């Protein structure tokens, strides 16, 4: 079985075209994310699972004073991110690493993760959320845009694919939005909410109060 990194290395050449076919309202997800960040424009943003850099590009285009760091396990995805973000090198840092145990240094006004957290098991999500809380600045936020498992058996039947491919079965582990909100609260975030949802994709936000 391929690792997540190997899978995304192979998928990188076709990722940008295919992800828009796979994820409903992909652009709307990013519009929601930018709207959240624009309320109080952050100075420093970290993107966990940055992929080919589309989210980072949306951030640097919309928020001209913001510096961004992107972390991804796939060298091929990061290579494409570097190409996409050419011209913004003074505001962008790209790092290879695994979000299971991310090497996060310093603090960030906002930490993002788009379509990456569902690759983690439940206990890994809980651990990651605790790590993220430690590195979000007081007054900052954590945004998770991802697939979420439906809590209702009827909705699972309506929206879930009848058979998963080998990668999905081995590496995709979505949990419900309610479980995510519970874990984010347990990690220490002071306010958590679902701010956008369509079928099995959604955007969650967790705020850390000023202290």
Feature names for model-found ranges:
Residues 190-211:
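Core SAM-dependent methyltransferase catalytic element
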Residues 1-39:
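Conserved class I S-adenosyl-L-methionine
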Residues 143-187, 192-194:
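C-terminal alpha-helical "lid/dimerization" subdomain adjacent to the S-adenosyl-L-methionine
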Residues 46-48, 52-101:
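Class I SAM-dependent methyltransferase SAM/SAH-binding core
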Residues 126-138:
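A short glycine-rich, Lys/Arg-flanked "PGG" loop and its adjoining helix->strand segment in the class I
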Residues 103-111:
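A short acidic, Gly/Pro-enriched loop at the edge of an enzyme's catalytic core
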Residues 113-117, 145:
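Residues lining the SAM
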Residues 34, 57-60, 133:
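A structural alpha-helix within SAM-dependent methyltransferase catalytic domains
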């Amino acid at each position: 079985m391929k690792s997540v990194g190997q899978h995304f290395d192979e998928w990188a050449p076709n990722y940008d075209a295919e992800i828009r076919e796979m994820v409903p309202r992909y652009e709307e997800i990013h519009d929601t994310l930018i709207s959240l960040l624009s309320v109080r424009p952050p100075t420093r943003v970290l993107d966990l699972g940055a992929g080919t850099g589309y989210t980072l590009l949306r951030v640097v285009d919309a928020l001209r004073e913001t510096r961004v760091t992107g972390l991804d396990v796939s060298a091929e995805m990061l290579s494409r991110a570097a190409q996409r973000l050419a011209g913004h090198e003074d505001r962008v840092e790209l790092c290879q690493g695994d979000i299971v145990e991310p090497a996060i240094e310093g603090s960030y006004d906002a930490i993002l993760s788009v379509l990456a957290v569902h690759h983690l098991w439940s206990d890994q999500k809980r651990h990651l959320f605790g790590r993220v809380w430690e590195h979000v600045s007081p007054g900052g936020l954590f945004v998770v845009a991802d697939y979420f498992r439906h809590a209702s058996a009827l909705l699972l039947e309506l929206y879930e694919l009848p058979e998963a491919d080998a990668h999905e079965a081995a590496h995709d582990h979505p949990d419900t939005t309610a479980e995510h909100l519970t874990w984010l609260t347990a990690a220490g975030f002071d306010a958590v909410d679902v701010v956008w949802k369509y079928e099995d994709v959604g955007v969650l936000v967790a705020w850390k109060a000023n202290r």
